[in-house]
């Protein structure tokens, strides 16, 4: 049995294949967050059906489809690469067809679709955060330099609309941790250990949860 492919098949999506075609200094290769890691996040109950999650660097949309399906929350995926974004849109079309019946002419602008999972083709640092978005998910999608700008945007959104905001980081790099510790508004909440999921643990297999105070 292959858990990754089994869940993809269950959701009628294709997210398993690695893609480094657009990797550069500021943008990491596409690598899907493992489903068993997302299971641990769901079990922690840090995310509820009332949350609106933004997946920064969403790739082909796995996080959005799975959280929307298992938790019932809304998820918006932000992806800078137009080719990978198009694959996320194709996954959305096949997922909706699988769950709701035949779908004709799915729009590339998925904001037009009445679905719990949507996608937007824009760089994360240029994305304008909406007041109802309160959970932000990261799996090292871009450089610490871009992360710094994104964090500032989230903090500004908090100033404009005070609300509970959580930031979720899977397998954060040392550069990410350093950037997070440099932002005084961020408060470390908890760490979910994921190392038992891997035979060759690197010691950073965890989910770190922060909130804005």
Residues of each region from the PLM?
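S-adenosyl-L-methionine
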Residues: 1-48, 87-131
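Conserved class I S-adenosyl-L-methionine
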Residues: 50-57
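Glycine-rich SAM-binding Motif I of class I
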Residues: 61-65
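Conserved SAM-binding motif I beta-strand of class I
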Residues: 74-79
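Conserved short alpha-helix immediately C-terminal to the canonical SAM/SAH-binding motif I
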Residues: 83-84
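A short SAM/SAH-binding and catalytic strip from SAM-dependent methyltransferases
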Residues: 133-146
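C-terminal substrate-binding/active-site "lid" region of AdoMet-derived donor-dependent transferases
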Residues: 145-206
């Amino acid at each position: 049995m292959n858990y990754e492919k089994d869940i993809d098949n269950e959701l009628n999506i294709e997210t398993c294949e690695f893609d480094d075609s657009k990797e550069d200094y500021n943008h990491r290769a596409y690598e899907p967050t493992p489903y068993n890691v997302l299971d641990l996040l769901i079990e922690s109950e840090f995310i509820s059906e009332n949350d609106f999650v933004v997946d920064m660097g969403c790739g082909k949309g796995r996080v959005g489809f799975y959280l929307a399906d298992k938790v019932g929350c809304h998820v918006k995926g932000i992806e800078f690469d137009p080719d990978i974004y198009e694959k996320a849109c194709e996954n959305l079309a096949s997922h909706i067809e699988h769950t709701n019946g035949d779908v004709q002419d799915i729009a590339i602008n998925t904001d037009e679709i009445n679905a719990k999972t949507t996608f937007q083709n824009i760089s994360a640092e240029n994305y304008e955060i909406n007041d109802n978005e309160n959970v932000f998910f990261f799996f090292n999608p871009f450089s610490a330099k871009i992360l710094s700008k994104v964090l500032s945007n989230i903090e500004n959104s908090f100033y404009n609309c005070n609300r509970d905001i959580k930031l979720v980081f899977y397998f954060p790099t040392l550069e990410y941790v350093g950037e997070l510790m440099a932002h005084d508004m961020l408060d470390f909440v908890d760490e979910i250990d994921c190392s038992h999921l891997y035979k060759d643990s690197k010691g950073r297999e965890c989910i770190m949860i922060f909130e804005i105070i």
